[in-house]
């Protein structure tokens, strides 16, 4: 068996085109374009790259994009004041504060300060809680993007045994909730899990998000399983690889996401979708 490659670049572009068409229709109907505020504190190079891709995506679909590049010396109080201003701004539907924040800032406090109806990253406890109670509003971008990929490839996950490797607040935990909502029997593995191999070998669907290159040997993958690799790891050679041993895993899986070009593009596509959703459902008067 050779796995079908799940093309995240293609699906993300489709999603962005759909959002762009809906924005165009809004403007033609005399409504305002959705607005996204992107806040970057400091000079972290990776964060600058991520923020740049988000701003470009905004422009591509016709959003109003407001950028706030703050110096590393910005205080927590100053950042909270900016968020207060953006919470009250009627032209802004989504507020994104790029993580990680500089040392000394309480990221939980900052994220909880964002209006839950403008929390387009889906990190606010209110939005995570809504998802856990099966009544989601704004959903965490990477897990939402993964569900979109599975849907667009008509992969029926209901009834599958899904194993999520990694329990972060950004991917692992909300991914577990998304898969429960989709009807999976879900196991979440983490650093205290005993016999990880046993769990992987039982899985019909594996989602790996640990940030360690080739962490999951391909031979562990069950024949015909669906493999979603969230990891993005840069080797000394400059090559990007995932958390799963791709070349071996693709000979056993039925579907697999590549790195790069799999899950990554879907995170930004989900952010764009969330911003339009927030505009249409919460802020259109």
UniProtKB/Swiss-Prot annotation:
Binding site for NADP(+): 166-168, 232
GO cellular component term, pick one: cytosol
Key words, A-Z: Amino-acid biosynthesis, Histidine biosynthesis, Hydrolase, Methionine biosynthesis, Multifunctional enzyme, NADP, One-carbon metabolism, Oxidoreductase, Purine biosynthesis
Gene3D superfamilies, per the entry: Leucine Dehydrogenase, chain A, domain 1 (3.40.50.10860), NAD(P)-binding Rossmann-like Domain (3.40.50.720)
Gene Ontology BP, a term: tetrahydrofolate interconversion
Pathway: One-carbon metabolism; tetrahydrofolate interconversion
EC number, UniProt record: 1.5.1.5, 3.5.4.9
CDD domains linked to this entry: NAD_bind_m-THF_DH_Cyclohyd
PROSITE patterns (UniProt xref): THF_DHG_CYH_1 (PS00766), THF_DHG_CYH_2 (PS00767)
Presence of the UniProt keyword Oxidoreductase in the record: yes
Function: Catalyzes the oxidation of 5,10-methylenetetrahydrofolate to 5,10-methenyltetrahydrofolate and then the hydrolysis of 5,10-methenyltetrahydrofolate to 10-formyltetrahydrofolate.
Membership in a protein family: Belongs to the tetrahydrofolate dehydrogenase/cyclohydrolase family.
Subunit structure of this chain's protein: Homodimer.
Protein name per UniProt: Bifunctional protein FolD
